[in-house]
Amino acid sequence: MRRYVWRGSFVECDLPDRPLEVADSWRHSSGRTNGLDLHLARFSRAAGRLPEGFVDRMLPLLHEGELFPRIALSQGQLLLDVRSAPPPRPATSLTYVCAPDPRTQPEVKGPDFDAFRAYRGRYQRDGTDDTVIVDRHGSMLETTTGALVMWDGDALCVSDGAWLPSVTLHQVAARAETLGLPVVRRRLTPELAAAHPLWFLNSLHGISPVSELHVGDEVITPPAHPAAGEWRDWWWGGFTHERGGGIGI
């Protein structure tokens, strides 16, 4: 990993890890991204307008390989971490647990990262990829690293609770609406997952159908969505080369 701090331009540094007030991250594939403008807008809503030239100077640092860059605001400094990206996860296995919500700011990415690590360390089952966050009724809200959506026939169902405004969820919901498919808010429960397709969404793995939901000693296997492959191809086909210039918030 390479870390940079913004001082009118990016300066490589060895600052230690510390709490983040705001963060955002995305897959950067050989200079191509999917929805970078949406990620920058989400970051700027919480952290304030990015400095002039920030994006134009960032992109040349991200032109090669499969990367998972993260920008962050920490103690008044803007940071850029250039990290390697793992291979996309074709399916996701989740741990479901009824535990206190670890989030302090559900709609801001960054400040709860340490709490999420502790939450996974305490509750996540070996062999699963992530842990579900639930409301006081046990309904699934999201996971510590991504959004959750469920399909009920042609209807795309999103949680009726509070969750991070996921860029990938926004993209999926926008496509559903373009196709004339209803998007509805609903309680997402393990019982429903036993009979309805459940998808994990984030900008690193795209659309990753949930293959297993571990609930205590039971393993729920949500059914496959018949068009999952088409949807995944659509999302991965949305990567384009970024050249800066018009991108900036």
Name each region found by the language model.
Residues M1-S139, L169, A173-I249:
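Conserved alpha/beta cores of soluble small-molecule-handling proteins
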